[in-house]
Amino acid sequence: MTKTERYIQLRSMIPEMRRIKRIHFVGIGGAGMGGIAEVLVNEGYQVSGSDIAQNTVTDRLCLLGAKIQIGHAADNVQQVDVVVVSTAINAENPEIIAAKELRIPIVRRAEMLAELMRYRHGVAIAGTHGKTTTTSLIASVYGQAGRDPTFVIGGLLNSAGTNARLGTSRYLIAEADESDASFLHLQPMVSVVTNIEADHMDTYGGDFEKLKSTFVDFLHNLPFYGVAVVCIDDPVVREIMPRIGRHLVTYGFSDDADVQALNFSQQGHQCRFTVRRKGKEDLDLLLNLPGQHNVLNALAAIAVATEDEIDDSALIQALAEFQGIGRRFQHLGKFATPKGEVMLVDDYGHHPSEVAATIKAARAGWPEKRLVMAYQPHRYTRTRDLYEDFIEVLSQVDCLLLLDVYSAGEAPITGADGRALCRSIRLRGQLDPIFIASPDQLAEVLPDVLQEGDLLLTQGAGNIGALSRQLAVTELGFAKVEIAQVPA
């Protein structure tokens, strides 16, 4: 049976959304929103959307046939059947107001994802950190095994050139977003929880117990025959395990993990480890990603694939040939500066634990290099709530260029901005950070900072990613030695 024939057979088994033909996305330029929109375009729905700025997501959707408007206006929703809204959109948005007046259904992003998942074999990946990489690894393993899954990922899967794709099988692999508790809409067959930490606490009223209970509720959305795959190394996940009334598969470096990593080593961008599973022979693996945290992400993929009886040969090949995800320890090239060659890496991590894991991976893979980090804090509330943790982790690099906070729409908070954080790190005494008042100034400062052999790491979830790519394209203002292919 050809892929086309398989897809036709699959579509005959999945009911279309009754009366819904025209779907409009408010905030379509986000990775999660754009990914769902792409799947719906490919399913044959008439998709439109709006956002405040053009980006690579909107450009791709336009090429696929979606109608994209830059800017929000009431006229954008006049002829649609349903409006999908992202978390970033508030109730005063003119398109939301117009949709309410026209009695057009308004659904959250996760509700639309849940509809896509409802008649498929869903695999949902949740957790404070590692969701995007874990989802990408699972999608890659399933693809290598010939399962041809549909996937919706919060980052660019480099091998596919996109963050979403409509497959021809019954599998749907997707990130599950806990930031607004909307992952409770999902009803997958397999759920993964990578870890649980205090983040997005405004959603949970500042109550960490409520956050933990919400993760338990997410796992209980599984059917009684479903599988919960959880990281036993995480202390909070271990704590809630007795409350989970579903079949559990654990993974980690811990001796009591069902899927355990042993003999870890890292050389440059790659890791080697042995995986031990109950009832199976040990398997020696090469992972084309750096860091112990990424081995944990790979273990989650191994656990899911093993439960689904995917052949080990697909695991071995998918992990060894994994081409990475955009902005997840992404090597952008090597450049010659007046003082010598430097290496440029870009990473999305913006929580202290994520930044610490990235630093650890960089130290393990390139111990001889001086680590220069250009860090852009993301959200004033996160900077305020995790202030001391940020001071601790950012003090671990050799040279720190600290940008101001990327607000993500939040109002400034006194004492939780880049200048305050810079002062606090300096007072700690380990490091003398350089404050970068405007992103445009970063390129001006680099010539005085960079030395031969440095690893320059641009870090954060804001527009520092675009800035990093601009630095790569302009070769840091110096000469190119070796430049990786840089996706837009």
UniProtKB/Swiss-Prot annotation:
Subcellular location as annotated: Cytoplasm
Keywords noted in UniProt: ATP-binding, Cell cycle, Cell division, Cell shape, Cell wall biogenesis/degradation, Cytoplasm, Ligase, Nucleotide-binding, Peptidoglycan synthesis
Reaction catalysis annotation: UDP-N-acetyl-alpha-D-muramate + L-alanine + ATP = UDP-N-acetyl-alpha-D-muramoyl-L-alanine + ADP + phosphate + H(+)
Binding site for ATP: 127-133
InterPro entries: Mur-like_cat_sf, Mur_ligase_C, Mur_ligase_C_dom_sf, Mur_ligase_cen, Mur_ligase_N, MurCDEF_pg_biosynth, UDP-N-AcMur_Ala_ligase_MurC
Molecular functions (GO terms): ATP binding; UDP-N-acetylmuramate-L-alanine ligase activity
Any one Gene Ontology BP term: regulation of cell shape
Pfam families assigned: Mur_ligase, Mur_ligase_C, Mur_ligase_M
Entry EC no(s): 6.3.2.8
Main subcellular localisation: cytoplasm
GO cellular component, one term: cytoplasm
Major enzyme class: ligase
Associated pathway: Cell wall biogenesis; peptidoglycan biosynthesis
Highest taxon above the source species: Bacteria
Function noted in UniProt: Cell wall formation.
Entry's family note: Belongs to the MurCDEF family.
Official protein name in the record: UDP-N-acetylmuramate--L-alanine ligase
Organism: Shewanella sp. (strain W3-18-1)
UniProt lineage: Bacteria, Pseudomonadati, Pseudomonadota, Gammaproteobacteria, Alteromonadales
